């Protein structure tokens, strides 16, 4: 019988370029196996049909996954006009077809209506859960579940290309935005219907897909060098100001005590001691308090 290799402690963030046709969980499990990591998670589901940036967190980095879940996302999307599907994307069954007579000017005018704060109805084919079960399971069983409209923000919406019955767009949006729903709503506003036929996530917060690695590149790397493809844990909080602590201060913070500091900061900060990342602290009423700390023996 082949002995099972024990999982090891791995801490960091893998900026993965997920291929189209793979689930986010499938990508996570493949990367986890290649790194032989004990603990792993991802920072928000990317649809199977979509490709692009999927940050995977390992070990202590999983404590900060929520930061990327809450971050703005940027996508490049392809939209087919004149056809609607039951899923809102190319994987679904066609439910209606309409003639298309759309000019670039008309499309630009409709796109302008979707910039800023908008309301969206989450699609039935989504990972949102009701009574512990994702909506897509109800949808596959032919059951329609009542959903609440969500207010989301489209920060930027740019038309990249247009060719009569198809266009591509670049979207930077708030968390919780469904690009499939955006494509369908644009099609409805144009009077011809539409579905999403391509989607690539190009950025999350300050992370860009240009820095991402593929599963093929990860697998091709020697096992001993794969950890070198990971970003350090503190990369997830690089936008917070840095505070360097003295050893005695660090000891107090690690024991859960607050510090009175001469400087009066605001909000969340990255905590370091001797160049080692300790976690995230927060200024409150002139005191620096621990907010989320990492296991110090594995801090990067």
UniProtKB/Swiss-Prot annotation:
InterPro entries: PsdUridine_synth_cat_dom_sf (IPR020103), PsdUridine_synth_N (IPR002501), PUA-like_sf (IPR015947), PUA_sf (IPR036974), tRNA_psdUridine_synth_TruB (IPR014780), tRNA_sdUridine_synth_fam1_C (IPR015240), TruB_C (IPR032819). PANTHER family: PSEUDOURIDYLATE SYNTHASE TRUB1, TRNA-PSEUDOURIDINE SYNTHASE. Signal peptide: none annotated. The active site is at residue 47. Responsible for synthesis of pseudouridine from uracil-55 in the psi GC loop of transfer RNAs. SUPFAM superfamilies: Pseudouridine synthase, PUA domain-like. Belongs to the pseudouridine synthase TruB family. Type 1 subfamily. It holds the Pfam family TruB_N. CDD domains: PseudoU_synth_EcTruB, PUA_TruB_bacterial. NCBIfam families: TruB. It is an enzyme of class 5 (isomerase). Keywords: Isomerase, tRNA processing. GO terms for molecular function: RNA binding; tRNA pseudouridine(55) synthase activity. It catalyses: uridine(55) in tRNA = pseudouridine(55) in tRNA. GO terms for biological process: mRNA pseudouridine synthesis; tRNA pseudouridine synthesis. Its EC number is 5.4.99.25. The keyword Glycoprotein does not apply. The keyword Cell membrane does not apply. This is tRNA pseudouridine synthase B.
């Amino acid at each position: 019988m082949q002995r099972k290799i024990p999982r090891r402690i791995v801490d960091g963030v893998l900026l993965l370029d997920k291929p189209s046709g793979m689930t986010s969980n499938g990508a996570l499990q493949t990367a986890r196996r290649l790194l032989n990591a004990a603990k792993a998670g991802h920072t928000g589901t990317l649809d199977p049909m979509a490709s692009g940036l999927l940050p995977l967190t390992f070990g202590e980095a999983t404590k900060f996954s929520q930061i990327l879940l809450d971050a703005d996302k940027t996508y490049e999307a392809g939209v087919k006009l004149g056809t609607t599907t039951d899923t809102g994307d190319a994987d679904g069954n066609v439910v209606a077809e309409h003639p298309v007579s759309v000019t670039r000017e008309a499309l630009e005018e409709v796109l302008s209506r979707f910039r800023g704060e908008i309301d969206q109805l989450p699609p039935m084919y989504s990972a949102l859960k009701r009574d512990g079960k994702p909506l897509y399971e109800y949808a596959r069983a032919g059951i329609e579940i009542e959903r609440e409209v969500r207010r989301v923000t489209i920060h930027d919406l740019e038309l990249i290309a247009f060719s009569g019955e198809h266009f591509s767009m670049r979207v930077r949006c708030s968390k919780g935005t469904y690009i499939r729903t955006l494509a369908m709503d644009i099609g409805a506003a144009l009077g011809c219907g539409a579905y999403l036929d391509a989607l690539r996530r190009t950025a999350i917060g300050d992370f860009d897909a240009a820095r991402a690695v593929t599963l093929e590149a990860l697998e091709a790397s020697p096992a001993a060098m794969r950890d070198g493809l990971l970003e350090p844990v503190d990369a997830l909080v690089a936008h917070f100001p840095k505070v360097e602590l003295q050893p005695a201060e660090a000891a107090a913070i690690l024991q859960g005590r607050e510090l009175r500091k001469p400087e009066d900061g605001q909000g969340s900060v990255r905590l370091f001691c001797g160049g080692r990342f300790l976690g995230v602290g927060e200024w409150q009423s002139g005191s620096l308090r621990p907010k989320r700390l990492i296991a110090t023996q594995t801090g990067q």
